[in-house]
Structure formats: C-alpha cells, structure tokens
Amino acid sequence: MDNYEGSDPWNTSSNAWTKDDDHVVSTTNSEPSLNGISGEFNTLNFSTPLDTNEEDTGFLPTNDVLEESIWDDSRNPLGATGMSQTPNIAANETVIDKNDARDQNIEESEADLLDWTNNVRKTYRPLDADIIIIEEIPEREGLLFKHANYLVKHLIALPSTSPSEERTVVRRYSDFLWLREILLKRYPFRMIPELPPKRIGSQNADQLFLKKRRIGLSRFINLVMKHPKLSNDDLVLTFLTVRTDLTSWRKQATYDTSNEFADKKISQEFMKMWKKEFAEQWNQAASCIDTSMELWYRITLLLERHEKRIMQMVHERNFFETLVDNFSEVTPKLYPVQQNDTILDINNNLSIIKKHLETTSSICKQETEEISGTLSPKFKIFTDILLSLRSLFERYKIMAANNVVELQRHVELNKEKLESMKGKPDVSGAEYDRIKKIIQKDRRSIIEQSNRAWLIRQCILEEFTIFQETQFLITRAFQDWAKLNSNHAGLKLNEWEKLVTSIMDMPISRE
C-alpha cells in the first residue's frame, strides 16, 4: 500500500500555514483533504452558538493558531493557555514556573494516555471463544435459484437483550450482506470484517464451497461480536434475535443508518492526550499492511498444502495396506508351506505391518481433521483481521477528506471585503449582510468539519489500539500448530517403535 505522504491528514509536512500581517496564506496547492484542517483545534470553542453575529469570537482560531495544522503536534496543544507571565516575579522564576507547569501537564497527559489505552485494550479479547454457531439447513429454498439458509445460534445472553430460552434464528447470505452494509454506514472508520464471497448457479450446490462459506460467515459474525463497539449495535442484536424473516422485518421497520459521529463532539481530554507518534505508527502500519497480508496468506496456504499432503499420505497408506494384504495371500503359493514353514511367520508379521499402516493412517486422518477444524481457522481469523484493517485504511483515505483549508481562505477574503466596505456610503447594506452570513456559514462548517476530523482521529486510534491485542492471535496459532504436530509426531513415532519391536523376530533364515 502506498504511504500517505502528501495526501493523508496524518501527514504534517504539506499543511503548514504562514501568517503575513493580517493575511493567512496556505503554503500548499493540494486538493481539499484533511491536510487542510487548520489550527490548534484545542482552542475552538464548541459551546459558542453557531448563529452568533459577532465577527471574531468563537468561530475560528486566531491567525496565530492558524500557523499550525491540526495534524502538526510539534508544539504543546495547550501551550497557548494558562501560560501568561505573572507580574512582579523575576524572569528566571517565571521560566521555572512555566517549565514546571508544562512538565506537570506532560506527566498528567502521559498518565491519562496510559489509562485510556489500557481501558480501550481491555474491551477487546480476540482470544475468547466464539459465541455464535452457524449451521447450514439442509433444505434449500427458491424457485429459480436455490439458496441456503443458516441456523444462527448465540451461546450466551447478548448485551442489552432480554433473556430468552430460544437463541436461534434463520438467516440467508443476503441478510449477512445487509448487516455488513449497515455497519459500514454506521461505522465507516471501524474494522468491519469481510464476508466470504457469494457465488451463483451450480457453484451454490458445491458442498465444499458451501462449507467454506458457512465457516467464513461464522468468522464474520464472531469478529463482529468480539468488537467492543459493533457487538452493542442495536441492528446487530436485532440480526441475532429477531426470529421473523429479516427481509420482511426490514421492509416494515424504521431504523437509523447515520454514522456514529452524528451529534457527537470531541472531548478536550482526548485532544490533550494526542501525540504525533500515533500518526507515524498509523502510517507505518498502512505502508506494510499489504506485505503483512501476503506473507500471512502464504503461511496459511502452506498449512493447507500440508493438510492436503497428509490426506494424500492417508490414501497411499490405505492402498499400501491393501497391497500388503493381497501379497500375503499369494506368498504361500510362491513358498509352499511343505518346503518353507517360515512363510507362515512372515505372513503373520505382514499382518502386523498391515495393522500398523491402518493405525498410522487413522492418526494421519485425525491430524487432517484437527488441522482443518481447529488449527487452520486460527490462522484464517488473523487474515480476516488484517483484511478488515486494510479496508479501514482504504476507507479512511477516501472518506476522511474535507475542505477546511479552502473555507479558511474564503473566510479571510470575505473579512477583507467587509473591512473594505466599512465607511463607504455607496455600499449596499444587503450586500454587507450577505457576506457576513457567508462568513458565519463558513465558520460553522469549519467547526463541524474540524470536529469530525478529530472524531475520526479518535475513532481510528481506538481501532488501532484494539488491533494491538490481535498480536496474541499469532502466538495462539503457532502454539497450537506446534502442539498439534508434536502430539501427532509422538503418536506416529510410538507406532513405528512398536512395529520395529514386533517384527524384529521376523524370520531371516531357516535356522
């Protein structure tokens, strides 16, 4: 994935503002994006009414503030407040007091950040057992195109729902598709899992494909239910609890699809905690997500190939067993018992070899079942999480743009017009009021878009923070991989040792 240099709002290199007397000029000619969000947004007053008629109170940062970008955190965001010099105090004492206050603010901010991070990470436990089971209903519906139905059962009581003995609903693939579309509308800056592909026609009757799709749907819904935000969504809970046909319910019900930022304001506490390093970490992750996915996909692919090789080994050993059995039937004809009584002992040992092949074949078959049933899903779930993170990167790049830079420039130009109109008797009062209303509208838009940009920043930081917990999925996957291989290698070794001991008395001479 390309880095976000130059087009990403986390980048600070292309968004600087410079002040020249009373004029503010942008130093970049880039297209409108979050790069242009101006000012130390901490100074914006969200409590100021948006319809005020005052020209310079509460709507915009001052020109001094506009020198910095919202994405440029090289200076203390609160450095402009609470730092005035106290009269009648020596200069060196003032510096000490200011430094002490700054150090105290930094320490408090660090402590708040640590608490915030720990609290966010505690809400996400990807290693927890799945709480949703999906089973395919054998009977297929549909006149022209047959479709599969799924029994979706939750094993525990769901949040914000009344206890019920009946925990099973019937859903179609299209219902899962609707749910994901709703989640994307409501939470565009969250890690929304992907769905397995849907195929039409004869492929829908392919049992292997249907099995993979069912497993993919199970991973999707369980990832949703492990997400601290998505799991409490009312439509997710509706999806899991409403027993009626969901298509009919959607036609009758009225539900809200507005995104989670509606009527929400950024907290001052979060703005105090913010650090530029978060943006750098985000961009580093974005730059390597494709490589990470490719490497992990290849690891998972090798695991699946290993499973197929073991299955091939099972088939070969079954064939080997049949051949040994058939061969033991013809040996008495090659070596008549009347001349070779040792052939009976050899045949008895061939029966032991046949039993060994049967046992080791059974062990290998059990190994493939454990790989496909328990081990492989642990690797694939991490693939799904990486894919959801990459999709978040892509949506962020597309949807996080705004035109704050242009609005600020527009406000400054209109303010200059108002200044030039003062004292001129030939100026229309209606024109003056019109420009004034435009300024107020632009200022309102700046505050709204800047607030949205900060909410996006907070949302994405939350997602990237809970994503850090998924590193332990790597640990669990390889631990289980090592245990599985060790256990089955031990079982196979034990069978081989038993075979060696058993056939050591096999005749090697007539004596």
From Swiss-Prot:
Q: Entry's Pfam families?
A: PX (PF00787), Snx8_BAR_dom (PF19566)
Q: Give binding positions for a 1,2-diacyl-sn-glycero-3-phospho-(1D-myo-inositol-3-phosphate).
A: 172, 174, 198, 213
Record-linked InterPro entries: PX_dom, PX_dom_sf, SNX8/Mvp1, SNX8/Mvp1_PX, Snx8_BAR_dom
Q: What keywords appear on the UniProt entry?
A: Cytoplasm, Endosome, Membrane, Protein transport, Transport
Gene3D superfamilies per UniProt: Phox-like domain
Recorded superkingdom: Eukaryota
What membrane topology is given?
A: Peripheral membrane protein
Q: Where is the composition biased (Polar residues)?
A: 25-36
From the Swiss-Prot or TrEMBL record, what is one GO molecular function term?
phosphatidylinositol-3-phosphate binding
Describe the inactivation phenotype: Fails in retromer-mediated sorting of VPS10.
Q: Name one GO cellular component term.
A: endosome
Biological processes per GO annotation: plasma membrane tubulation; protein targeting to vacuole; retrograde transport, endosome to Golgi
Q: Where in the cell is it found?
A: Cytoplasm; Endosome membrane
- Give the start-end ranges of region Disordered: 1-36
Looking at the record, the residues that make up the PX domain are: 128-247
Transmembrane ranges, per UniProt, are: none
Subunit structure and binding partners: Homodimer. Forms an autoinhibited tetramer consisting of 2 homodimers that self-interact, wherein the membrane-interacting BAR surfaces are sequestered and the PX lipid-binding sites are occluded. Interacts with VPS1.
What does the further note read?
A: Present with 2210 molecules/cell in log phase SD medium.
Q: What is known of its domains?
A: The PX domain binds phosphatidylinositol 3-phosphate, which is necessary for peripheral membrane localization.
What is the documented function of this protein?
Required for vacuolar protein sorting. Component of the retromer-mediated endosome-to-Golgi retrograde pathway. Required for efficient cargo export from the endosome, promoting VPS1-mediated fission of retromer-coated tubules that bud from the endosome.
The Swiss-Prot or TrEMBL record describes its family as follows: Belongs to the sorting nexin family.
Q: Name the chain's protein.
A: Sorting nexin MVP1
| Origin species | Saccharomyces cerevisiae (strain ATCC 204508 / S288c)
The UniProt gene name for this protein comes to MVP1
